[in-house]
Amino acid sequence: MNQKDFKNKREMQIFLSYFKPHRKLFLLDMVCALAIALIDLAFPFISRWCMYKLLPDNAWRTFWTVMAVVFCAYILRSVFTYIITYWGHTFGVRIETDFRRDLFQHIQELSYAYFDNARVGQLMSQLTSELFDITEFAHHAPEDIFISTVTIIGALIIMFTIQWKLALVIAITIPIFLLIVWKCRFSMQNASRNVKKEMAAINTDFESGLSGLRTAKAFANEDKELDKFDSANLSYRDSKADFYRAMGRFNAVMEFFMCILSAIVIAVGGALIMSDQLNIIDLITFSLYVSTFVNPVRKLSTTVELIANGTASLHRYVQLMRTEATLKDAPDATELQDVKGRIDIDHVGFAYEGDHDVLQDVSLHIAPGETIAFVGSSGGGKTTLSQLIPRFYDVTSGSISIDGTDVRKATQESLHKNIGVVQQEVFLFADSIAENIRYGKLDATMDEIIRAAKMAEIYDDIMEMPKGFDTNVGERGALLS
């Protein structure tokens, strides 16, 4: 799905588009769900038939044949349950994988400016726990709603064929309950969105605390970091309490409905029996069908929570996916080829978004092979100028050219492939030394890696390590001295 689709489509349209590649698994899940619902609906009807026809006539052979069929039906039901459990969750995981890949790819494509304000912990939350909520929503919600709908409607149809007056009373009660459920959904959804927001905040503080753990210990500031974390932790606790309060109201309403529905069946059914409009067998059948409502209604209660969590996470997902890169290739952008290395900086000015000018009317011309050092006080714009050359940001005024080509007229990919950048904050991936060196040229041979290590004057140090170039450097190079 491209950026245009995320801009033009509604959230649920975006959500349903992820079903398309896995529609066969989804269809299998729905067919098995339908089969389970039909088996559950058949049991009370078969029980009624046995009580009416077989038991009074002492039809032993037919009775046991029917019981054998029921037994086989429940074996099939178990098979269908296995299929729903295994393949249904497989379907959900595949959708989650697609969501996560699209989100990670989109994050990779965002401009430098986005990460000036973005928090790593929030992004981690959206890539992990919030995508899990969307997965549970994708897998369970359609299945549970489908089973519940088929079971409730099917049971009502059968009950109308038995005694329409009692069935009508039940049919009137159910929409009232569903209306209350729908209203509860909105309060739970709003509470769930707040939980997601606070969860992202606590992940941000957690990530920051872990990343700065050595610094905190060096300055004996553990208590300060704990206070910061406690504040976010308590806010998350309060948001969870609000969510559980909304969920508690919903569950209380649901339990009241189930109890009152059983009471209505006994009360109205008893009155109909006393007026010779209903018999005991049909009342038992009605009670059995009402009991079949219990599982679907309980599923609906869980589904409402899944919908609340899933739609809240989906909303945050779509918001992030709709965030566009501030820097894009020009329609007529060309690839830099056969780069010599001449850099022309002409009357460049630059200001970060909503900030004062960092650079004003800077001009500089660097010949191929020439070495230039920018020297000055902190905050003078040295790093900013170096980040404008590979076009991590766009100049506010003036221009920067490489071999006579304005960097805004070159593709960003070709710029980044031809310009090497060593960041102020050195970052090493949790991989081998060889793979970290190869990162600047993914197809580099081992000979090229060794040559690069010798040029950086680290070859001898590497060879003194037990595993040489295969030595794992750890997270951010923590295993190196």
Annotate the PLM regions.
Residues 56-65, 158-172, 246-315, 320-321:
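Helix-loop-helix
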Residues 1-40, 55-66, 84-92, 105, ...:
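Membrane-integrated ABC transporters
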Residues 16, 21-24, 112-113, 129-138, ...:
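An intracellular "coupling" helix at the cytosolic face of ABC transporter transmembrane type-1 domains
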Residues 20, 26-80, 160-165, 276-280:
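Transmembrane helix-loop-helix hairpins at lipid-water interfaces of multipass membrane proteins
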Residues 31, 35, 39-43, 68, ...:
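Hydrophobic alpha-helical transmembrane segments of ABC transporter permease domains
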Residues 329-330, 336-481:
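ABC-type nucleotide-binding domain
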Residues 1-6, 93, 101-131, 204-228, ...:
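Short intracellular "coupling" helices and adjacent cytoplasmic loop segments at the cytosolic face
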